[in-house]
């Protein structure tokens, strides 16, 4: 058994999976970011206006970054009513890619902010192929601090080092 495990480890080491190239510019349906408050504070006090504003700010940051990299953001108005009924497009059994394909996009981009506490937040982005539904790039980063600056840095890091990471 030890020999089999050692052989498998050697095989995997000798034949690494090739790194996937960053996605090429195309048409992207960005469904914005969703804020999910899992904290006790949220359960007791409800939605905080500064976090709603911060979610919009971070969505704009992601959209601007995509455009700066040569992507075309397709209008999502034709699916807006359906999108309103979806709690979280990041986790909807492929509804994001189905809507992106319907909109004529090459990619579906979704993201979320999970607030664990006022100190710990988890930021996530997912870029999927609209036709196949395959996840092309996805990443999560935990940040410390619930400020505009920590959110900006977190999403900038995700875009630069995960979604558009070079080999």
What are these regions (language model features)?
Residues 1-5:
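Bacterial N-terminal signal peptides that target proteins for export
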Residues 8:
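Short catalytic/metal-binding and nucleic-acid-binding patches
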Residues 14-16:
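N-terminal signal peptide c-region/cleavage motif recognized by signal peptidases
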Residues 20-40, 57-61, 68-70, 97-102, ...:
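C-terminal/domain-edge helix-coil "capping" segments
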Residues 42-53, 85-86:
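Second-shell loop/turn segments in exported
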Residues 48-78:
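N-terminal, post-signal-peptide region of Sec/Tat-exported proteins
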Residues 67-110:
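Short, solvent-exposed, polar/charged sequence segments at loop or secondary-structure edges
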């Amino acid at each position: 058994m030890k020999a089999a495990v050692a052989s498998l480890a050697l095989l995997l080491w000798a034949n690494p999976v090739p790194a996937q190239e960053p996605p090429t510019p195309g048409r992207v349906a960005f469904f914005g970011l969703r804020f999910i408050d899992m904290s006790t504070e949220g359960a007791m006090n409800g939605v905080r206006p500064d976090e709603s504003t911060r979610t919009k700010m971070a969505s704009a940051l992601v959209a601007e970054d995509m455009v700066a990299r040569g992507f075309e953001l397709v209008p999502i108005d034709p699916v807006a009513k359906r999108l309103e009924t979806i709690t979280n497009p990041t986790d909807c059994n492929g509804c994001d890619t189905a809507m992106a394909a319907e909109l004529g996009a090459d990619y579906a981009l979704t993201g979320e902010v999970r607030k664990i506490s006022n100190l710990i937040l988890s930021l996530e982005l997912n870029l999927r192929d609209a036709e196949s539904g395959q996840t092309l790039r996805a990443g999560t980063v935990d940040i410390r601090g619930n400020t505009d600056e920590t959110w900006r840095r977190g999403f900038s890091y995700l875009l630069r080092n995960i979604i558009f990471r070079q080999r």
